[in-house]
A protein has these predicted regions:
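Flexible, acidic/Gly-rich N-terminal and inter-domain linker regions that tether
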Residues: 1-223
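Radical SAM/AdoMet-radical enzyme domain recognition
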Residues: 180, 206-304
């Protein structure tokens, strides 16, 4: 969101009132915004997100359908939340297929990524903290005017089963805790408390406002440390939360995707595994330092 310039006090009330009455299409809304900016001599044309954030709770629920941004992202009724694990070396070392990793030409970034992907940049902003990343992504869905009551989380960033067991458990635990805490904070009555949401996230605000980001991060971290439970308890709570994680995906390699790994992942709530099968030729696997054989690939597929 761009920095807000001085605005006429009647600008947003007039605009919101018109949207409530007319229920405009996106093109009609764009034209009316231009017309109203000329009338009030306002140089900054507000985005749909800015309009939504200037509405009170009652108006916001009425005009949200006219202001929803990027509706295809949740058109299926499920919101995808991609979270990134911290940069970490694969147990066997680096292979030709992975551009990233610790000490890569892109810096210290997660394996298989360059640091320029949206999910990676979100991870960097939130210091690869699963709890903060989930809060940040849910915040983005809300300001886009989208529903996020059913979430499909994809844990990205490398061979997840190759991370230390405590890290894996903690990462999944804080993901579930974030969904539950976000639900309690902003959906305690069953519907979005927009006033509480805007107050917590210091909205309306400016993209890139470091002071605002620091304040929000401090609030999120304070929540993270409160009322710590077990993973099983958070998963049970999530079954009835306003925002439910209905799918959990991890990434791994064939040699880290055998039956023992699958059983552990099932206990942690994982519902889907992305198995990286780069080639079906042993010679290519050897030359690219992949760290496993075609036999391992076949065994992994059979086991999982």
């Amino acid at each position: 969101m761009k920095a807000l310039v001085e605005e006429h006090s009647d600008f947003y009330p007039v605009l919101i009132s018109w949207i409530k009455k007319e229920k405009p299409t996106k093109s009609q809304l764009a034209l009316y915004k231009l017309k109203l900016c000329k009338k009030f001599k306002q140089r900054h044309i507000p985005t749909d997100i800015e309009i939504y954030l200037h509405a009170d709770s009652e108006d916001a629920s009425v005009i949200r359908s006219c202001l929803t941004t990027k509706p295809m992202r949740t058109g299926s009724g499920v919101s995808v939340v991609a979270t990134m694990t911290k940069p970490y070396k694969c147990p066997h070392g680096a292979c030709t297929f992975c551009p990233g990793g610790l000490g890569s030409s892109f810096g210290d970034v997660p394996m298989s990524y360059t640091g320029n992907e949206p999910s990676t940049m979100r991870g960097i902003r939130n210091e690869y903290d699963a709890y903060r990343i989930v809060f940040n992504r849910l915040e983005q869905y809300i300001v886009l005017g989208q529903n996020c009551d059913k979430v499909d989380q994809i844990i990205m960033g490398g061979t997840f089963t190759g991370f230390p067991p405590k890290y894996r458990e903690s990462y999944i635990y804080y993901s579930f805790k974030a969904y539950n805490d976000f639900s309690k904070l902003f959906f305690s009555s069953g519907k979005l408390d927009l006033v509480a949401f805007k107050k917590f996230f210091e909205l309306p605000g400016k993209v890139g406002d470091k002071e605002r980001e620091a304040k929000v991060a401090s609030k999120v971290l304070a929540l993270k440390s409160k009322d710590v439970k077990t993973l099983e308890e958070e998963q049970e709570l999530n079954e009835k939360a306003a925002i439910r994680c209905i799918g959990l995906t991890i990434e791994t390699k064939p040699d880290w995707g055998f039956a023992s790994h699958g059983l552990e992942l099932l206990k942690q709530g994982v519902t889907r595994i992305e198995l990286w099968v780069q080639t079906i030729y042993d010679e290519v696997l050897l030359r690219t330092h992949r760290g496993h054989t075609v036999k391992d690939t076949l065994k992994s597929i059979a086991d999982l």
